[in-house]
Amino acid sequence: TLFPYTTLFRSDYLKFEKTLISLNGKVLNKGAVFTLIKSNVDTKLYKENIFISQNIFMNITKANEKERKIIEIDNKPARLRYAELLGISPSQIENATLKNPIGRKIGDSIYISSIAGIEGDTLNMYAQVFENTKVEILKAQSALDIQKQTINQINSDFKEIYGIFCINCILRFLQFEAEGNLQELSKGLKSIGEYGGFVSYGEQFNKQHLNQTLTMLVFGRKK
């Protein structure tokens, strides 16, 4: 990567029909807009997710990478194997996917691919998946505890913060809204500086496409 970058996949407020972007008055529903920022202050890119390993590993043995579908896990139908590994019945999967997404580890970082839905025994994914890769089923931690860690990290890196550009996954938004802690999390982020951004259907953190993640570009003066 020549320089750090983050992007988002625009949402349409859960209609799942089409998304629109605009540049200089031209509106598109299939396209991308890129913004290059040259800043005279310090910047740093962060990502936050609330999921950790629970040591449930599996191999994607058959996938449709173009359509983001997992067909087989460990040479078994994906839906059945996912349920088996979690210790639940296949009928309970839809209630488990939001808090048990699939993760792939690169270095010390976990990148999330969220389950979009079940089609027969196939798992439809929001982010890219690759055949013949080892992945794992994750579990959620306290969003408030994770946010405190994020805030502490940013405050340890910067002595002054001028602003934060945020991209927050729609699935995080829905989860936090359902748990009743959305306002408290918003106040926590506001405690470190002014911020603004978008709710997205997917996030990009440098070269990695991922879900259920908050990416933040912080502007300020580093310590």
Residue ranges and their predicted role:
Residues 1-5:
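Short, exposed "boundary/linker" segments that immediately precede the start
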